[in-house]
Amino acid sequence: MWLLQPLLLCVPLSLAVHGQQKPQVPDYPGELHCGLQSLQFAINPSPGKATPALIVWDNRGLPHKLQNNSGCGTWVRESPGGSVLLDASYSSCYVNEWVSTTQSPGTSRPPTPASRVTPQDSHYVMIVGVEGTDAAGRRVTNTKVLRCPRNPPDQALVSSLSPSPLQNVALEAPNADLCDSVPKWDRLPCASSPITQGDCNKLGCCYKSEANSCYYGNTVTSRCTQDGHFSIAVSRNVTSPPLLLNSLRLAFGKDRECNPVKATRAFALFFFPFNSCGTTRWVTGDQAVYENELVAARDVRTWSHGSITRDSIFRLRVSCSYSVRSNAFPLSVQVFTIPPPHLKTQHGPLTLELKIAKDKHYGSYYTIGDYPVVKLLRDPIYVEVSIRHRTDPSLGLLLHNCWATPGKNSQSLSQWPILVKGCPYVGDNYQTQLIPVQKALDTPFPSYYKRFSIFTFSFVDTMAKWALRGPVYLHCNVSICQPAGTSSCRITCPVARRRRHSDLHHHSSTASISSKGPMILLQATMDSAEKLHKNSSSPIDSQALWMAGLSGTLIFGFLLVSYLAIRKRR
């Protein structure tokens, strides 16, 4: 304990004698809260400055970087706004009990022992260094002496290390975009002038030095006052499309005092006590929590044939926490956003489609007018099965069986398996290739699509063993599953080691779809007649060939009759 007073002297002295010229140490505004079991310290860096690092000195005067250390009772975290938040237990390795009379902790007079003073004369003290850089880029440390009174359990304090704020819990200042986007004529004052920028920012408001004005930004600004009131300012531009401010109200408030105390074209300001307007209260640990909720109506546009809206539900929950052992100072203020509503489900038609793409990129597809599609044997055919006219990302498509038939009837006895239980049929010497689908502009929901390619084939007459010329149709049976991407909505194909049975078992819970039209499959090789046709120098008419044959027969018969007549005369 006796080492603490010399320590307070040596820390600033070591900074002063480090160089010939003392650097200009930047001053970081900070907020200290003294709780029952610990102290909380928040550092707010200046705009454009890097997040500062915190160091601390132990009883021997050795510096340590502050970090999360449950053994030493320190916790450090960074808020989304860039502030550094320190929480240190009064039993921390770096917190000491300081006992003094009327002198400040910088004098050389030894402190009075704790046994000789009242609790009001003793404090918990923690020395924190805030590391930063000065204008010349040199590394400097700003020392903060955090002092909390060793109060009886029925007291709690909030004290400030910067000029006296207008409230006890410092809020994050809005970013520049939220401030600059408010036109001068729409600015709603947050505090009266004159006011410093630091005090204005602690209110969570915007500051303009040229007019010394403090005003609300295009967001929700909520505060808890010392006398037990909510102060909530809501900008119409907090949502897109903008809010209907004239419909904004407290969800459970019916009295006149629950209406906005000030409303403009761009802002609505609510100010009401905790014991009214349907505010709920409960106690958790040593804190009392007060909570209320704001709601707004949707902007509905109507014309003679119907109504539309582009708004979602707006609900804003605001909460304030106070120490149950104190009736003066708020501990924290929180604004909660309502989670998005659950997806609405209803019965309705579900459209499935089987299409054939013109190339492997699936950039275009054959339409009704393009059928029948003519393909040569062993040409690839790119097939796609998809869910149509749905936007639910939780839906998935399962492809069970796909097969081909020589006619429109999907139940034809003559058929060839393409996919069996969602996997390529291994009995084919040209196996079907499954094609993965990635998210893209034309496929925003990849789980809606299944793609595969097959090689063109021709059905063969079982008895005569010749290829059947005629149309070939494709068919698939599919099912819809939820949620997409889970094991119940995915088929894994094993490594094929033996010939798979080709029987297709159609599930009763699946739907069957077919291609929009047939395919005409042609032989890629030429027969003898085609070769003769190709090698001829001129086209050969079949009727001319018939006449030539008939003439030859007649000439041969005439010659034969003449030969027999001459022989008879002899």
UniProtKB/Swiss-Prot annotation:
Subcellular location as annotated: Cell membrane
Domain ZP: 223-496
Upper taxonomic lineage: Eukaryota, Metazoa, Chordata, Craniata, Vertebrata
Glycan attachment sites: 68, 237, 337, 477, 535
Keyword ATP-binding attached: no
Topology feature Extracellular, residues: 20-545
GO molecular function: acrosin binding; structural constituent of egg coat
Cytoplasmic topological segments: 567-570
Keyword field contains Transit peptide: no
Maturation propeptide residues: 497-570
Family membership: Belongs to the ZP domain family. ZPB subfamily.
Disulphide bridges: 402-476
Gene that encodes the chain: ZP4
Protein's UniProt name: Zona pellucida sperm-binding protein 4
Domain notes: The ZP domain is involved in the polymerization of the ZP proteins to form the zona pellucida.
Keywords, comma-separated and alphabetical: Cell membrane, Cleavage on pair of basic residues, Disulfide bond, Extracellular matrix, Fertilization, Glycoprotein, Membrane, Receptor, Secreted, Signal, Transmembrane, Transmembrane helix
Region forming the signal peptide: 1-19
Annotated P-type domain residues: 177-218
Post-translational modification comment from the UniProt entry: Proteolytically cleaved before the transmembrane segment to yield the secreted ectodomain incorporated in the zona pellucida.
One GO term describing the cellular component: extracellular region
Transmembrane regions: 546-566
